[in-house]
Each structure stands twice: as C-alpha cells, then as structure tokens.
C-alpha cells in the first residue's frame, strides 16, 4: 500500500500538519472525498475507511508512507492496526518526500530506488510464498 487513505474522517494529525503540502493538500482531499462519498455517507464505513473495519485475517501488507503527505498518519495508523489484529505488516515512512513521490523517481532518486527495491522485494517474497 503506497500512501494509503484509510480514514475518510480525515482525523489523522498529518492531515493538518501537511495541509498545504506539495502535490496533495487537505483542501483537495476534502474535495475528492466529498465527490466520492456524496452527502450523508458514513465516513467511518469500513468500505471507505478500512481503518475502522475488521482487519484480522487480512493478508500481509507493506505500507509505504511519505513524510510530507497529509495521508502519512493514515498509513502509519493502518499498519499499526493491522499488526494489532495479528496481521503481518511492515511500515516504511520515507522522509522529506511528498505524496506522489513514487510516481516521480527523478525528484528524489535515492528514495525512489529504495521504494522500488522494497516494493519489488516484498512482491517477490509474497509470490514465492504463494507458489
């Protein structure tokens, strides 16, 4: 999971801390959420906010977050919740990069290489275990 949105209530501290971050702002998050959910939808519904759902029995997860991202704490909280539910979850928070860094490998080459290596290693490991 790369910078996952797991809480449509937008109650994570990083939503405020990085409200004016490059690429993804709090304002754009509110716009996206409101268009997606429409009026009257429960923002804690696990179908849109998996952080509030049952997590036991889910497959192992790699959660990658960006330090300068309003969604950073969503990912951190989700990884912690998965672990608390007995799910194998690994978390990496990439420092000094914004949301979207994985799509911009030239913006922070060393971070991009590390992200891609970690992701490929985890996928390879999961496929080896499954097959």
How would you describe each model-predicted region?
Residues 1-131:
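Alpha/beta-hydrolase superfamily serine-hydrolase fold, recognizing
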């Amino acid at each position: 999971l790369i910078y996952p949105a797991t809480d449509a209530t937008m109650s994570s501290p990083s939503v405020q801390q990085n409200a004016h971050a490059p690429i993804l702002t709090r304002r754009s998050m509110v716009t996206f959420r409101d268009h997606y959910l429409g009026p009257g939808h429960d923002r804690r519904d696990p179908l849109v906010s998996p952080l509030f759902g049952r997590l036991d029995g889910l497959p192992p997860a790699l959660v990658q977050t960006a330090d300068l991202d309003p969604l950073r704490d969503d990912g951190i909280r989700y990884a912690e919740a998965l672990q608390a539910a007995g799910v194998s979850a690994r978390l990496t928070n990439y420092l000094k990069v914004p949301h979207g860094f994985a799509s911009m490998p030239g913006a922070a080459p060393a971070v991009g290489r590390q992200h891609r290596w970690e992701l490929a290693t985890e996928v390879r490991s999961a496929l080896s275990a499954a097959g």
